A protein has these predicted regions:
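Glycine-rich Rossmann-fold phosphate-binding loop(s) that bind the pyrophosphate
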Residues: 3-4, 149-152
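Glycine-rich flavin
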Residues: 3-142, 168-171, 175-180, 184-187, ...
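Hydrophobic Val/Ile/Leu positions in short beta-strands of Rossmann-like dinucleotide-binding domains
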Residues: 147-148, 172
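N-terminal Rossmann-fold NAD(P) dinucleotide-binding loop
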Residues: 155-156
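Gly/Ala-rich phosphate-binding loop of Rossmann-like dinucleotide-binding domains
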Residues: 159, 163-164
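Conserved NAD(P)+-binding/catalytic subdomain of aldehyde/semialdehyde dehydrogenases
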Residues: 232
Length: 232
């Protein structure tokens, strides 16, 4: 039973589309520095963010269709709808197309519902100035500046992608004392050096206390070891 795309968050709104974006960013940087590899490119290399996003979404869509094919091949019935547990071994499924409700029974019911982004108390997601990973995956234009709160795998990927695509100022803000805190120390140190070399403003041991969205740009109040900093 699935109400959205097959493959869940990872395939449609996580690991796969971000890797597609990063591949485009890598190709863009190769083109910008083609001379370093012995090539000459006539004219100016420009990034078309709409086409970059289109490619990323296409990669996810193709893989999602592949999952659907495998389900059919293995004789697994796909039900497009939203399920509600109603009693022992019974679920009611509301069809996504016509809202009809159908009851299904099963000896065992597995809950594999995925996840969704959670807003910070002082920075509710509005989809415009404060965005979640979903909006970050499908930008219609590149911002002049960007602050990424949290430097786990997802946050670090977005910081690198947007900076690689030409965003002038990118902050990567981490509460703990290093970025990618779940990775090995030597890996974190190397990636941190690479990010700083790429122009990403890495802030560790930093806590965002407030986000002011009333002006043209967001203003963040960040508590660091050196004191309170205001960034924009």
């Amino acid at each position: 039973i699935e109400k959205a795309e097959l493959g869940g968050v990872c395939l449609n709104w996580g690991c796969i589309p971000t890797k597609a974006l990063l591949k485009s960013a890598q190709a863009y940087n190769y083109a910008l520095h083609a001379a370093n590899y012995g090539f000459e490119i006539e004219g100016t290399v420009k990034a078309d963010i709409a086409k970059v996003v289109e490619r990323s979404r296409g990669v996810s869509a193709k893989m999602s269709k592949g999952v659907e094919f495998l389900l059919k091949k293995n004789k697994i019935t796909l039900i497009k709808g939203e399920a509600t547990l109603c009693e022992n071994k019974v679920v009611n499924v509301t069809n996504v197309d016509d809202s009809t409700v159908t009851k299904y029974t099963a000896d065992h019911i597995i809950l594999a519902v995925g996840s969704r982004p959670n807003s910070l108390p002082f920075a509710p997601i509005d989809g415009e100035k404060i965005i979640s990973y979903r909006q970050a995956l499908v930008p219609d234009k590149l911002p002049k500046s960007l602050a990424v709160i949290g430097s786990g795998a997802i946050g670090s990927e977005f910081a690198f992608f947007y900076r690689s695509m030409g965003v002038e100022t990118v902050y990567l803000i981490e509460y703990l004392d290093r970025i990618l805190p779940l990775e090995d120390d030597d890996v974190c140190a190397q990636i941190s050096r690479s990010f700083r070399k790429a122009g990403i403003k890495v802030m560790t041991s930093a806590q965002v206390q407030n986000v002011d969205t009333t002006g043209e740009n967001c203003k963040l109040t960040v508590q660091t070891k050196k004191g309170v900093e205001e960034i924009e």
